[in-house]
Amino acid sequence: MTTFQFLKSVTADKSNLLERLLKLLHDNNIRYCVIGGVAVSAYAEPVISLDVDLVVTNYQLGRFESLLANTFLIKRTPRLIEITAANSRLRANVHTDSRLADFMERAEIRNVMDMQLPVACIEDVLRAQVWQFEDGTRKRS
């Protein structure tokens, strides 16, 4: 069993949420990078989570959000767009904090759970965690 197959099993993702979201990003040339626990998987042993955290470029955020509305269930908060789908326990969290915008400039394509994805550099992954902790927005594990 591959890491990706294991993720699909753990998240009971029968809706292919992650694949559909990544296709939407790719097909619409929306720049993004992975942050959070899944990004850590690019630098260490795989971390399996029910959340995939992303950052999308600020100037494409409005268009991206309108594209999501036709395909996914969306919950918007001041700093986050939570994307879910029926038949999946997986959540994609698009962080909208403007401090994260520069992360894409330093992101590199890396192997994450058997997928080649743009991943924030390790310093930015840590920086995002520190900011979320300081702001009180970090999810409790």
What are these regions (language model features)?
Residues 1-141:
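Compositionally biased terminal segments of proteins
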